[in-house]
Amino acid sequence: MIIKNITNLLQVTSMRDFFAYIYNSRKINRVELLRLLKWQNYGLVVRLKAGFKETDIEHFARCLNLNDDEIEIFIKVS
């Protein structure tokens, strides 16, 4: 699957890769964080929202184990 963002194209093969990218990148554009990304391979809808205070890397790990048809994951980038 491809994540299209403002600065580049990122190819990811799993949600774990995606979260690692988000966690490791400190240059993510705030406009990009408000985009709605559709994950065809997982049946998930991931809404990126800057500054959601209750999320952290442990929350990301818990989300990887969810099997819902559609979930919203709110990601904080510090």
Predicted regions span which residues?
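Flexible coil/turn residues that form the inter-helical turn or adjacent wing/linker of helix-turn-helix
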Residues: 26, 50-53
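Short amphipathic recognition helices of helix-turn-helix/homeodomain-type DNA-binding modules
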Residues: 71-78
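Short alpha-helical DNA-recognition segment
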Residues: 26-46
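DNA major-groove recognition helix of helix-turn-helix
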Residues: 48-49, 56, 75
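DNA major-groove recognition helix of helix-turn-helix/homeodomain DNA-binding modules
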Residues: 54-71
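The DNA-recognition helices of helix-turn-helix-type DNA-binding domains
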Residues: 40, 51-52, 78
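A short, Lys/Arg-rich alpha-helix, primarily the initiator
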Residues: 1-32
